[in-house]
Amino acid sequence: MRIMPIVLANCRWSIPLMLERVHEASRVTHAHPRSQMACGLYALVTRNLLFHRAPGAAYRYAMEGARNLYLQEPWRDERRNFGRLLRGTLAEVPEREIGSNGYVVNTLEAAMWSLLTTRNFRDCVLKAVNLGDDADTVAAVAGGLAGVAYGIEKIPPEWIDALARKDDLLDAATRFAAMASR
């Protein structure tokens, strides 16, 4: 969940440098290579969404790149854990096969699947929540992707209006966006 600001602030950097920063951030609490790779895959999709690719294209392009980027150790041994994601066919997986129990691979798959099988912010987040189990984590990850894909103006206004300290949050987001666009 903390990866999104790193990608937003560093999306113009080279992909290897951006991934290095993302992996460093992951290691603070989740040092296993599998967790770092999950964060890297999330970052690659986010970066592609930022460059105005539609969700399906952003996902496929990111996975194509990931198959080439994660060839060396320690990533090579972890690739098998991300098979469904890396094949680029996650949207075809039936809902009953999508896990949402908080395990890093399942969380990433569930969030990405929610994005790929819906067409707007609201439906993406609700689909993620309705998978159950670790719904708040999956919805936060999916919501980050959907926010980049569809923009703040597509977030239901009643959801924004319900935020505690809404004005402070919107001000912080505006300042962050200005900093990230430099």
Please tell me what each predicted stretch does:
Residues M1-T118, C124-N130, L145:
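Amphipathic alpha-helical interface segments
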Residues M1-R2, A135-V148:
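Conserved phosphate/anionic-ligand binding catalytic regions in large, soluble enzymes, centered on
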Residues F121-V125, T137, P156-E158:
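Extended hydrophobic-aromatic, low-complexity segments
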Residues A128, A139-A142, W159, L163:
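Active-site proximal loops enriched in glycine and acidic residues that flank catalytic Cys/His/Asp
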Residues R119-F121, S181-R182:
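Generic structural signal for short, solvent-exposed loop/turn connectors between secondary structure elements
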Residues V148-R182:
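Conserved glycine-rich phosphate/nucleotide-binding loop
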